[in-house]
Every structure is written in C-alpha cells, then in structure tokens.
C-alpha cells in the first residue's frame, strides 16, 4: 500500500536567464520544461542545464513552485 504522498512528483523547470531578462523585456518569453523527480533522492530544489529557445543557448533551469 502507498503511504501518504507520492515519491515521484512533477516539477516545472524555468530558465533563470529569461526570468532575469524578463524585467528588461530583452527576452520574448520564458522557457519551461516539465519533468519528474524522486523526493527521497533529491529533497532540495532541482537545477538542470537545458536548452533555452529564447536565449539560443544552454542555460540553468531551476525548479519553481506550482
């Protein structure tokens, strides 16, 4: 039987550079990826290097709250 909360949860990763540049309106949008993480293995915030189509390069995408 499953206890309480699920071990695997869906997380949203957002480009850190697009968020910073969004204030200056240099970027036309914000890149977001949806993925899963295991709560037991990675209890802290997830950060991955992914390709951002708005920055045209690989940048750090950090986990955001839903």
Curated annotation (Swiss-Prot):
Localization in the cell: Plastid, Chloroplast
SUPFAM superfamilies per record: Zn-binding ribosomal proteins (SSF57829)
Entry annotated with the keyword Kinase: no
Pfam annotation, one family: Ribosomal_L33
Entry keyword set: Chloroplast, Plastid, Ribonucleoprotein, Ribosomal protein
GO BP term, example: translation
Family: Belongs to the bacterial ribosomal protein bL33 family.
UniProt-recorded name of the protein: Large ribosomal subunit protein bL33c
Source organism of this protein record: Platanus occidentalis
